């Protein structure tokens, strides 16, 4: 099962670590990694040109919002109503089981669950919770 909607990973300065991309590669889930022009070649060497989208701007000083908006517009231009958007620093996926957070390797199931709920509820934004353990 491949996701019904495109997956984007926004990234800057992490062409070597590529944590989220590696997680998705392990389970053969297709994605695009979205980067600024000055890092495009570095990401292409790491991931292959077919996976890398080059932003039409660089160093705007506005955080990740312009890149997120680019992904939204890119997905809409391809005819998608929804898309997945991930940061580039996800090491693991987890879910709550009996009140405890457990590592979850069934990422495809999680994507399918979100897709089904988006289609069923017709909400504009639906996604995953970020959890950082300190």
Regions found by a protein language model. Give the residues of each.
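Short, hydrophobic beta-strand segments that form beta-sheet elements in well-ordered domains
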Residues: 7-11, 29-37, 126-127
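Soluble or luminal CAZymes and related metallo-dependent hydrolases
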Residues: 16, 63-67, 105-113
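Short amphipathic alpha-helical segments and helix-helix/interface helices
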Residues: 20-24, 44, 72, 111-115
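Conserved acidic residues
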Residues: 5, 81, 124
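Conserved catalytic core of nucleotide-sugar-dependent glycosyltransferases
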Residues: 93-134
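Structural alpha-beta junctions
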Residues: 25-32, 47-53, 113-124
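Active-site-proximal specificity loops/subdomain of glycosyltransferases
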Residues: 35-86, 91-104
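N-proximal low-complexity "stem/linker" segments adjacent to membrane-targeting elements
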Residues: 1-26
